[in-house]
């Protein structure tokens, strides 16, 4: 039977606990440093608390140490890895191969000492930042000892299935929901080039969410100030079973910068969908953690932050994967503007509105405008200020549902582990057994004068304040003893304590057994040059930012893009000359293709282009970026100019 894992984001401890409470089998969270979201750092103490809470439900905690690291940060990284291991984390997500060497070569004292007494170290997961889009790359990572690989978001279900067929022993983690990067992860240098903020260092400036003109070689403007690289949000909620059949083990929700209401709603929605799949195939799949959730709301993905939804490339190239009008959340469709007055208007539709709702629309200039509802009288809405550009017939969306947010602001889920207890007499007292754990008390046996079964069940079922709920108490058919309620309470509390201790011990062994790892694997390794991944002759695409990683790859010096830019060398002397191939650097590799989006991809049945190559993206400040349409690999590449 294969376990299916719902993996949720945790901006902080509060979000992590909410994710567990709403059905997550695992959460991923960033520490103070070296996580791919600078704005989502957490103390090791908070991570320790999250591990303790999650492990009650056999849920796991993964920590992102998935940025590239500079030489002067290696010692701090070692210390962090030691602290995370001591905190009880279950896995580390890695991009920089220097981290791999530290964890597997015994460079981290606490990791080694933990392995000595429990025989395990945290699992290694290859972050999507390692650009995992081919069978060859996943095989290479498996050979290095990675237990799991986070696949590129761009892969189709057929590509995922092929990777699983070729590398069946590696767990495959796939993104199923949330924001999409337009470039293959780990291969985007636009933010660093434009603003000195590295995406590979967790400081992406989101160039892909900016407005561009699209111009041809003659300067003819094909598009004016549109969000041409801004993708919609991923939503694979209807395709989880298909992904499981393809070999996916972990279903990942993006959103380590999202708030707690987002986490609650999205996790609950996906948890319910996974449960329905397991109910359909009870002999094939099971959840990766324990417990079931009871919600006080009905999950609805349309009511949470989204830029519109797409399945991206799950079933091949699709025409409607980006949102050129806005990079912001539009929310759910609620109707169209009907009759307008000076301070109000009617909405044609069936949606119910509440005071304080946030609504938005796309105006005639293709810009998103929003406003707040001050008062709702049925379908007549009175905005705080009447939008000047609102017109009859315009489509309305709700990006903030006040009633729904009020539900989520309260306790919105309870997660419990159902247990069946067995109470039995022993020679000198009684035993209470459940889930493989037995508690005992010593006392004299007293025959009951009247039936005690109902009272016994009532007393043993008082599990409030614990993660457990009693689904039944079994006793021998001839059980007819009187046990004082105080002794039953002691027996119940003893079992809870023993089971909790056992769960913590069990979850200390979520890592890899050290003696199963071949430490000789961690040597100089040549990353595969797969024909399906062009441009690897650019040395910076390996993201080698320190000498430990350079030694791993068998090169003399670090070659990371970040090391060749003025922002890195500021205060450190003169920056070296660009170490590329004597041409403008490649900044993005995208499966999203503007030529296809405009209907000019002949390969996919489009019309023959009428513009002159090359095409350029142009920011509002005049900076240009040359586009290359690599039809052989069905990929659009973006170069600096």
Give residue spans per PLM region.
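Surface-exposed amphipathic alpha-helical tracts and adjacent flexible/coil segments at the periphery
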Residues: 1-22, 26-36, 50-51, 57-85, ...
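Aromatic- and glycine-enriched glycan-recognition loops and surfaces
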Residues: 39-48
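Well-ordered mid-protein domain cores that form the structural environment of catalytic cofactors
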Residues: 78-107, 119-139
């Amino acid at each position: 039977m294969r376990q299916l894992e719902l993996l949720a984001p945790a901006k902080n401890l509060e979000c992590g606990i909410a994710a567990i409470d709403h059905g997550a089998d695992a959460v991923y969270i960033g520490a103070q440093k070296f996580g791919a979201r600078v704005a989502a750092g957490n103390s090791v103490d908070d991570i320790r608390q999250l591990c303790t809470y999650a492990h009650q439900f056999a849920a796991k905690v993964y920590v992102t140490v998935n940025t590239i690291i500079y030489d002067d940060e290696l010692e701090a990284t070692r210390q962090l890895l030691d602290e995370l291991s001591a905190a009880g984390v279950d896995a580390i997500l890695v991009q920089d191969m220097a981290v791999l060497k530290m964890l597997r070569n015994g460079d981290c004292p606490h990791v080694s000492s933990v392995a000595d007494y429990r025989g395990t170290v945290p699992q290694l997961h290859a972050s999507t930042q390692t650009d995992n889009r081919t069978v060859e790359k996943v095989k290479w990572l498996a050979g290095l000892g990675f237990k799991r690989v986070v696949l590129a978001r761009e892969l189709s279900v057929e590509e995922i299935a092929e990777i699983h067929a070729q590398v069946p022993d590696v767990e495959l983690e796939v993104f199923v929901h949330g924001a999409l990067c337009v470039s293959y992860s780990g291969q985007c240098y636009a933010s660093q080039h434009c603003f000195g903020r590295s995406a590979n260092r967790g400081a992406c400036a989101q160039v892909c969410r900016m407005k561009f003109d699209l111009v041809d070689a003659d300067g003819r403007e094909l598009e004016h100030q549109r969000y041409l690289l801004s993708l919609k949000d991923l939503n694979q909620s209807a395709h989880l079973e298909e992904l499981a059949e393809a070999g996916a083990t972990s279903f990942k929700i993006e959103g380590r910068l999202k708030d707690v209401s987002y986490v609650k709603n999205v996790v609950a929605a996906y948890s319910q969908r996974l449960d329905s799949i397991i109910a359909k195939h009870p002999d094939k799949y099971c959840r990766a953690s324990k417990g079931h959730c009871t919600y006080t709301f009905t999950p609805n993905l349309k009511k949470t932050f989204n830029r519109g939804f797409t399945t991206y490339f799950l079933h091949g190239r699709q025409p409607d994967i980006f949102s050129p009008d806005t990079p912001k959340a539009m929310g759910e469709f609620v109707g169209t503007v009907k009759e307008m007055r000076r301070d109000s208007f009617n909405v044609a539709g069936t949606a119910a509105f509440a005071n304080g709702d946030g609504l938005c629309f796309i105006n005639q200039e293709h810009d998103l405008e929003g406003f707040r509802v001050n008062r709702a009288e049925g379908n007549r809405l009175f905005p705080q200020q009447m939008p000047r550009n609102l017109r009859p017939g315009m489509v309305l969306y709700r990006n903030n549902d006040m009633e729904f947010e009020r539900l989520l602001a309260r306790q919105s889920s309870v997660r419990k582990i159902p247990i069946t207890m067995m109470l039995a007499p022993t020679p000198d007292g009684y035993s209470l057994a459940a889930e493989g754990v037995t508690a005992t008390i010593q006392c004299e046996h007293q025959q009951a004068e009247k039936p005690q079964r109902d009272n016994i069940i009532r007393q043993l079922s008082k599990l409030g304040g614990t993660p457990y709920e009693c689904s039944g108490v079994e006793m021998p058919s001839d059980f007819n003893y009187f046990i004082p309620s105080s002794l039953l309470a002691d027996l119940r509390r003893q079992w809870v304590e023993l089971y909790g201790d056992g769960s913590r011990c069990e979850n200390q062994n979520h890592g890899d057994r050290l003696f199963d790892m071949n430490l000789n694997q961690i040597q100089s390794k040549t990353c595969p040059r797969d024909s399906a991944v062009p441009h690897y002759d650019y040395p910076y695409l390996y993201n080698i930012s320190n000498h430990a990683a350079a030694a791993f790859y068998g090169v003399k010096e670090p070659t990371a893009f970040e090391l060749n830019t003025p922002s890195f060398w500021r205060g450190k002397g003169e920056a070296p000359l660009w170490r590329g191939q004597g041409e403008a650097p490649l900044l993005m590799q995208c499966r999203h293709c503007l030529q296809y989006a405009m209907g000019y991809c002949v390969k996919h049945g489009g019309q023959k282009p009428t513009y002159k190559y090359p095409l350029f993206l142009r920011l509002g400040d005049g900076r240009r970026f040359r586009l290359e349409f690599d039809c052989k690999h069905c990929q659009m590449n973006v170069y600096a100019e």
